[in-house]
Amino acid sequence: MTSRKTRKLVRAGLAALAVVPMLALAACTASGTTSTPNAAPSDGVLTIGLLGDIGQPPDPDIYYANNGLAIVLNTYEGLVQYKNDIDTVEIAPRLAESWEVSPDFTTYTFTLKPDVTFHDGTPFTSAAVKSSLQRRVDVDGGAAYMAAGVASVDTPDDLTAVVTLSEPNSAFLDYLASPFGPKMVSPTGVEENAGSDNAQTYLQTHDLGTGPYELSAVEPGAKYTLTQYDDYWGTKSPFTTVELPIYNDVSALQLAFDKGDVSAIVAALPSSSLDKYDGNAAFNSDMLPTLQSALVTVNPSKPFFAEKEARLAFLQSIDQEKLVDQVLGARSEPATTLYAKGMISDGSDKQNIEYDPTVMADYAKTLPEGSEMVVGYASGNTNAEQMANIVTANLQTTGIQATAQSYPTSQVFGWANDPTQGPDAFIDGNNGPDGGNPYMWGHVFWDKTGGINYFLCDDPSTDADLNEAVKTGDEALFAKAAQTYSATGCYMNLSYNKDWVVSQKWLDGVAESHNIGANELDFSLLSIAE
């Protein structure tokens, strides 16, 4: 149940795909906001603006990154998903109508939806479940771990798939519901276009899913186009075409939206733009639930934070409530737990870091004069940059020579190879787990093999507890793991973040098309308001 594959920083929260020109952004947020709604399209085209290119091919067994999920989740479907339009984690049907789980969490039996076809015309049957899970393992992309524990898939009939795991795993349904989870891929299409790479080349510019839309045109760096699948089994929207143009800076994206050239922007605008759209009669502004947070991680391989005393003092110096309110505003609230909000039902993962700047001030007096430290943030992340500047300014009042520094995403993920090359601490403006099970949070962020433990701050007992807890879903053991890891002083959950979606006034169904697991919309559930 471990993985060293890395996942790119989530969505615009930490996407180093675009640099924000701050003066231009300030200008477009300060004035010129229209209060007259733009006209709805009459040609059946929905336009979703992307901030930066998608970074990886939209192959569901490869893609493990940011805004390209808008393509993956509208062209492919899994057996289950997280339920739309609620603020809690609940598994809902997709291509499986129902399922049964054995008491020991080793056997998962799915009853499949009938009369579903892939975009190449191949019927969706239990054979496709078997081949799709196998392809996930064979391709060995970033989220291969979600199928790595599958021992066998039995297909007693076309509409029944029995998945047996090699060991108990209570998180398996969450793996399948994850936006990065296994999606169903046409076995015929894969075989016909296999080439030498299991159809990976083909799926760079085509799709083989069952979703409401087909990938019809790919212009890397410029635009992606989806076309409605005529034989889709589910709800169809009035939008027969979805265009996803790419913008390389947020001000250009925002201006296009203001003019009506873009229908909606999902999780891409900085919090500094909140006031512009809140209550504006021309636009919708929706704050939708997610599992994501702003996070602080501390680097124990750096001399400044070699001792736990220093790490804990630093975390106590952060005025969490003020920082979240000042920078993130209405899209966030201060986090009170170590996992995502509500992930542990009784709240026993309570975060016990209390703001007390005197602890760091006293510790600073023991340091050599002029001691330096660096707080990092991802390039292009306006929110994280502002938070890093505030944190370092406060540290400077203690005599510590603290500075804030930006790092490109590629460099951030290189730190796991040598944490000494990283900063002393790092602020994630927005990051989250692969799914709604506590294991998918703790393993990813706290285990050095999990993928987003940048500085490899690892506690073996935490890892052992997580690996044991996932077998049965033992919340008490998950909570124990969280408290043990928190005591290392390597981690702080700053805020619970919401997915901020701005859309034209004529666009209806935004909340209904969104679920807590992904910062994306199901385009088939969108419509034009009457």
Task: Report residues per predicted region.
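Ligand-site clamp/hinge motif
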Residues: 201, 229-275
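Gly/Pro-rich hinge or "lid" segments in bacterial periplasmic/extracellular proteins
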Residues: 180-235
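Periplasmic-binding protein-like
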Residues: 58, 301, 305-343, 386-387, ...
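Surface-exposed binding/hinge segments that line
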Residues: 145-193, 217
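Extracytoplasmic/peripheral linker and loop segments enriched in polar/acidic and small residues
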Residues: 404, 410-412, 440-505, 529-530
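Structural transition elements
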Residues: 329-366, 379-386
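N-terminal lobe/hinge region of extracytoplasmic solute-binding protein
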Residues: 49-101, 134, 208-209
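Long beta-strand-rich cores associated with HINT superfamily self-processing modules
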Residues: 501-530
